[in-house]
Amino acid sequence: MGRIFEYFVVCGLGPEMRTVDGDLGFHGMQTFYLPALLDQFPPTDQSPYPAPPPQLPTCVLPAGVEFHSSGFVSSDPASFPRSYPIVLTEGDGSKIFVSCIAFRDRVCEDIIEAYRLPPNTYADKCICLVSHAPNFRVLRNSLEEIFVLCFSSEGSCKPLWDIIAYMVSNVPLPTPGKDRVLFAVENCLLSVEAPPEDSLPQADISLQPLVQCLDVDNLIKLFTSVLVERRILIRSNKYSLLTLVSESICHLIYPFRWLQVYIPLLFFSGVDYIDAPTPYMMGLHSDVDTSNLAMDGVVVVDLDINQITTSEEIPQIPEPEFSTLRNDILKLLHPNVVAIDQLKGFGNSVEQCPKSLSKPWGEDHDLQLRVIFLKCFASILGGYRNFIENKVFSTDAFLKRRSRSTNQPPEPMLVQFLGSFAFLDYLERRLSSDEKSTNLLEKLQDAVGRGQDAMSILPKSSMEPEIITIAEPEVEESATRYTYDRFPASVRSEEQEEKRKQILAAASGALESNGRHPPSSPPGKNTKEDNFSSMERAAERERMVLDIQVKLQGLWLRLLKLGSDEDPLSSFEYGTILALIESDAEGIGGSGFIECIREHLYSGWHGQLSEEQFIAVKELLKMAVGRAASRSDLSTVRDALEVSAEMFKKDANNVSDYVQRHLISIPIWEELRFWEGYFEYLMEQPANESVNYATLVTARLIIVASHMAGLGLPDTEAWNMIETIAEKQKLGYKLLIKLRGFLSHVQQLRVGYWGASSFKQQAISAGLPSPRPKDVSVSDETQQPSEASGRSWVQSMFSRDTASRANSFSRVRKWVSDNASSDITAAAQKKIQTNVRVLKGHGGAVTALHSVTRREVCDLVGDREDAGFFISGSTDCLVKIWDPSLRGSELRATLKGHTGTVRAISSDRGKIVSGSDDLSVIVWDKQTTQLLEELKGHDSQVSCVKMLSGERVLTAAHDGTVKMWDVRTDMCVATVGRCSSAILSLEYDDSTGILAAAGRDTVANIWDIRSGKQMHKLKGHTKWIRSIRMVEDTLITGSDDWTARVWSVSRGSCDAVLACHAGPVQSVEYSPFDKGIITGSADGLLRFWENDEGGIKCVKNITLHSSSILSINAGENWLGIGAADNSMSLFHRPSNAGTKVSGWQLYRVPQRTAAVVRCVASDLERKRICSGGRNGVLRLWDATINI
């Protein structure tokens, strides 16, 4: 049987001090420091439960640890102990419930001595009970009894840790609806039980704080924001309120679940996560300043002043459910006011105001409030079961039926809710067999249909629970009482004690070193060193350096010779090397240690380490590199980089894991200045005189790229730095392409085996976080500082798969990587748009999408209703017309006629033309949707179609031909162009008669169809040409050879080669206003190019998307992007941006779901982007909000 208490944990000030900003050591009494895990019962290796999460210390003391001159003072409320719950969410979405008591406790004497603190100094400490069971009350009551017992003047009859151990080890989880467990903490009797499984889920909290902090309208507004999955930030000056309100609202949305990021109490230094674009519910203390954050689109709920603010309107719950919900809540909260005009004891007034409502708030009120919200869901989703066929819910049909019954158009709130992850998750659970028997929503719908009371669906308690008593251990009678002046530490092992001494000795030594070598000597005081000549001082320093290096050499060799039963991390050798590196202000220890490794490698050592040695060496190198980087000692950093690439261990699959891969958290690798210095160092090394300069530069840059990949630097950031260095060396585009290919190749090899690096975790420390003083099997070799653990945990929540969502927060933290300086600031990062509609109708993958523009239908005054339509084609052989102006009923018509996959679509004022794998081109009447003509003549699948003026159609196919058709006669007028292979892309200028086509033969062909002659064959690409764009005399082509090329149409010459993508260039666009070029590749990268001193230069890189760029559409002020990972983005160029292509600024991005997209089309006039997925679903994003 499981236990209700999994761990008892103590967090506070550890022997290694770090500020919340990551600075090592003591930095004053007014500074906040990172909390550490001090004690834990039971040890992880003795527990059946997973270890407490590493972010626990950061989360239970969210502000950090502060020093105080006194402990509890009755006249100072700020010194009072605080009791509050927190909830942590793991990567799989499961919750960990923690009860905390934070208080001021005396700092240990050895820490005071090591850091020279004032005597009787106090610091923040927190004791916690950790459980996966949501029993908030028993967790809090038990913890408070422990705390009172510790500081009681009467003391306890047993040592405090014995009481804790017995309680944690012996109190079982009660059987739901059957048991009540009784146990005692000293002389206090406590109990715990759980509701039946067929009842509402256990909510061991009171909902009263929620209804006390928010009035009815704000409560409903918060409830609605949760249902439509907005970004929600809850503020309060009390930790408890943040957790209680968050948990309460999660219970009120039953039977649905909040599947987005959930952090009821965010640690203070994580405030920057509020700007994340992913939906979240987070709580933040009111003292934390958010004025420098964009906060655009965030729903801010201020519990202290009963206020909700947001820059984006929250849709209202539809009627009549909104009025019913509001009245029911008012009736519960204010029964006397609601029923003041009713005659008591007459008619139904007694039923309307139950007697229990006149009592103080209790569990009955909690239950009734939850049922009120369940009734709201039952009404809104009335009859939803009738629209589930073959395990698929028909949203459109349900909305149409509801619109007919309410005589209202589809409500925006309901449309958004039915497309939410919460609703989709509920449907999946509902369709599983284990969910149907306990589905209270459907039980309530059935009960209401029979005219029964809503409370009748809840199980009746027919019997008293069985009492299970946990007997106290027998204690020999003794007059001894255990009293404490501070919360006691558990007993440390010899190994833990030794680790603690090493950390404190290193800290003390660093202070002494700083004391012996002050920045400047006091005036008038001559030291011994002042009497040395410069030569004597140099000789003395040289002797000191030599002495340290000799000691390090011996320590290093002894560290490698430790026996298999000896732990290097707890050895004297490791501790001494660490102290020499950490306490040496001049860097002699760090550089000397790296030199020892280098000499050992030169002597013939192969660099292979055991698992334990690998951990020790890795952490020592981290410390050495971090210290060297802080001193700008780039030569030591360079040497460490090189030796780390030589030392390795073998993993379980006999694959080498190099030390270098584990140094990624050090910030120096992000700095261009380091890599430029390293490249210059490599260029200074001896080289074969017969090698030309370009080849030498390329070889040296390959070495740089190898180290970048070995570290795990993100591909885009690594390439930006390599490209910058290469451009300064004037490398040609062919060598640039080779370099790009090499970097991508080694990156793919690394990611293929090790996975993507968590590069964006905050690098708080450059070295090993020293072992915890009482590290009861909780410290392992990968332990991070608690702040880094906290940030890593938050990032893992943003990046985890949540109901098919795959959204990497690392891309949120840095949307744009610009090789100059990014102009997309936090303020310019516009809000995530939630207005995304899901359009269903196709039975196969969507393979073609077309946007009907005003120019296409000659809409000069805005009276054409078809301007703004989207037209889609699919593998189901159907063409569908969608009207975005009809919310909930977007499907306008379905065109049937093709027998193969639809590959291309175009239209004009009156007609639609589509091309298919069935070798045919069909022309449809746009108004009547009737099939007008079927044009046959191609010998292979049709890949491109284009409507022209004068009832003409231009088509291209995989047979290599381009044909002109006259729709009126159903005849092919002429084959206007021929290529040697399949045509994949087509452009035509109707005003000049110039036609351009390209495809698999790697040649771009240009014809003048009016003269019937071919003008040019543009050769240069080495692989398929995927996309072309022609504007006036400029032709742009994008190819699978990773380049785009710019050509002159009149001269037939290549004006520029646009290289540096890491994959096929699948989309190209010309921005006519600024005469810039935009390219998108399979690497997910957008590159903006503009003319610069007679050439074309890349001026901006955008890393917002993580998969192939499928569509780029540039207008005068708007730019729409769509990618294969179902992500979209809209850019805006302000009128004052000038004529530079770099003036494009990210306007907003929509929420993204995990789906593979085949095609994208955008309507910039209405700021809409539509994507077609492999699952047959279209996602229509409407970003129409005034600027």
Curated annotation (Swiss-Prot):
Database matches in InterPro entries: cDENN_dom, dDENN_dom, DENN_C, DENN_Domain_GEFs, G-protein_beta_WD-40_rep, Tripartite_DENN, uDENN_dom, WD40/YVTN_repeat-like_dom_sf
Consequence recorded when altering S131F: In scd1-1; temperature sensitive mutant with normal growth at the permissive temperature of 16 degrees Celsius and growth defects and sterility due to defective cytokinesis in guard cells and leaf epidermal cells at 22 degrees Celsius
Biased composition (Basic and acidic residues): 526-536
Effect of inactivating the gene: Defects in seedling development, root elongation, leaf expansion, flower morphogenesis and fertility due to defective cytokinesis in epidermal cells.
Listed CDD domains: WD40
Localisation: Cell membrane; Cytoplasmic vesicle, Clathrin-coated vesicle
Segments of this protein annotated with the region Disordered: 508-536, 765-793
Membrane topology summary: Peripheral membrane protein
Cross-referenced SUPFAM superfamilies: WD40 repeat-like (SSF50978)
Keywords for the protein's UniProt record, in alphabetical order: Cell cycle, Cell division, Cell membrane, Cytoplasmic vesicle, Growth regulation, Membrane, Repeat, WD repeat
Tree of life domain: Eukaryota
Coiled coil: none
Segments annotated as WD repeats: 841-892, 897-934, 937-975, 978-1017, 1020-1057, 1060-1099, 1104-1141, 1152-1187
Domain cDENN span(s) in chain numbering: 199-330
Signal peptide: none
Start and end residues of each uDENN domain: 19-179
Domain dDENN: 332-437
Key word Cell cycle present: yes
Protein function: Involved in growth and development through its role in cytokinesis and polarized cell expansion. Required for plasma membrane internalization. May function in clathrin-mediated membrane trafficking, including plasma membrane endocytosis, essential to both cytokinesis and cell expansion. Acts as a negative regulator of basal resistance against bacteria.
Subunit architecture: Interacts with FLS2.
PANTHER family in the cross-refs: DENN DOMAIN-CONTAINING PROTEIN 3 (PTHR12296:SF21), DENN DOMAIN-CONTAINING PROTEIN 4 (PTHR12296)
Protein name: DENN domain and WD repeat-containing protein SCD1
Gene source species: Arabidopsis thaliana (Mouse-ear cress)
Gene: SCD1
